[in-house]
Every structure is written in structure tokens, then in C-alpha cells.
Curated annotation (Swiss-Prot):
HAMAP family: SfsA (MF_00095). InterPro entries: SfsA, SfsA_C, SfsA_N. It holds the Pfam family SfsA_N. This is Sugar fermentation stimulation protein homolog.
Length: 230
């Protein structure tokens, strides 16, 4: 199902990652600095010469945002902001049964020592939701994380505490890759997160994974829920 469309969208050639947030790309024979919002290592994508896709941005030290990379004839979305916008469309269109009838009442609610992504109001009460970008591929699996994440550990701990306090809590993994049908944690990336997800499941945290990708035309396509293996 089409969720939204990105325009304008420019193909580019990825040259190198300058730092955590900036990459060099070639667009129409010009070398440009592009914003990278995903703080994962993304080693399977950040390969010199790989075809990426950018959109212009206003202001700042970068003129473009690196949204994704060509993958199996489509686009894997690495941009976490775009993933977030797509997730909000899924909520708005009531495409995730567990969140039917819900609406966002607060973004980045403070919980303990962290800020989670969303607080939603639903017919059966409120729910705290944290989203994570799962763009590491292993066969038909989308995986998270691709490197140690203290922040990710902290977020899962906060969700566990919420669930144990009787509140509804959910973590949603955004498998923004074409041709994946399942999600699992990448234990080599961060063994502690894999352990915490098992603890979260036992504590009552709802764990979901969603499949989406971008077409070369810029259309964001939602493919439904992915199977979850914790």
C-alpha cells in the first residue's frame, strides 16, 4: 500500500562517510555533502560507488538528505526521519491492528532518563511507542542493531519498566528493506539488546516489526507486518 511520496528525489553516487552525520555524494557531476540521520554503521550500504537517493534540504551545512540506497531494484530507506513519517502514516491510516483507533498526543515524551518516540491515546488507554530502524539484512530477515547501542538499551529498559508498572508499551522495528519478511535482533551487533528484548517480551512489552521500502519513483510502500523472532 502506498503511504506517501517523496519529491524531488535524486539518484546519487555514494563516495564516503565523512562522519556520523555527513556523507559525500555525487549528484549531477557535483560533489555534495548529504545529511545522514541514521547513526548505525550501515556498512553494507556505505560502500563507495553504491547508488543512493537524496532529496534537497534547506539550511545547515548539508544541501541534501541521504534517504536510502538502491536495493533489489527498489530503495532501502536508511533515513530515520522518513521512516518515522511513514510510521505516522501507518497510524493515521489505521493499518496496524494493535494501534487502530489511536492518535499521537505527544512526540518524544520524557520517560525516566529517556525520551521515547511517541505517546498515543487509544480507545483502551494510552500507549508508549518506541521505533527502531532495522535495515541490516540477513537473508529474509531485517535486523537491529548493527552495532552496540547504549541508547537503544536504555529505551528498552524504560519500556520494560512501563510494562511492569501496568502501562502499555510497544517497540516497533521498521524493516525498511525490500524483500524481507521477518525480523530478529542482531546478537553480534549488541548481545545485551537481544537479552533485553527477551526480557521485554516476558514483561509484556508489545514487539512488532513493519515492512516498507521506497520505489524508484519516490513512493513509500507499506507491505504489512513482518514476522518477529526474539
Amino acid at each position: 500500500m502506498k503511504l506517501m511520496e517523496v519529491s524531488p528525489l535524486f539518484p546519487c553516487i555514494f563516495l564516503r562517510r565523512v562522519n556520523r552525520f555527513v556523507g559525500l555524494v555525487r549528484i549531477k557531476e557535483r560533489i555534495e555533502r548529504a545529511l545522514i540521520t541514521n547513526t548505525g554503521r550501515l556498512n553494507e550500504f556505505m560502500i563507495p560507488g553504491r547508488i543512493g537517493y537524496c532529496t534537497p534540504k534547506a539550511g545547515g551545512k548539508t544541501r541534501y538528505i541521504l534517504l536510502g540506497f538502491e536495493d533489489h531494484g527498489k530503495i532501502a530507506i536508511i533515513d530515520t526521519r522518513l521512516q518515522g513519517k511513514a510510521f505516522e502514516k501507518i497510524i493515521e491510516k489505521e493499518l496496524l491492528p494493535e494501534l487502530e483507533g489511536c492518535r499521537i498526543i505527544k512526540r518524544e515524551p520524557r520517560v525516566g532518563e529517556s525520551r521515547l518516540d511517541y505517546l498515543l491515546e487509544c480507545s483502551k488507554g494510552e500507549i508508549f511507542v518506541e521505533t527502531k530502524s532495522a535495515v541490516l539484512r540477513e537473508g529474509e530477515y531485517a535486523m537491529y542493531p548493527d552495532c552496540p547501542s547504549v541508547r537503544g538499551q536504555r529505551h528498552i529498559k524504560e519500556l520494560i519498566k512501563l510494562a511492569r508498572d501496568g502501562k502499555r508499551a510497544m517497540i516497533v522495528f521498521i524493516g525498511a528493506l525490500p524483500n524481507v519478511s521477518k525480523f530478529k535482533p542482531y546478537k553480534k551487533g549488541d548481545p545485551k539488546i537481544a537479552e533485553l528484548l527477551k526480557e521485554a517480551l516476558e514483561a509484556g512489552v508489545e514487539i512488532r516489526a513493519l515492512g516498507l521500502h521506497m520505489e524508484l519513483s519516490g513512493e513509500i510502500i507499506y507491505r504489512g507486518e513482518l514476522g518477529v523472532e526474539i
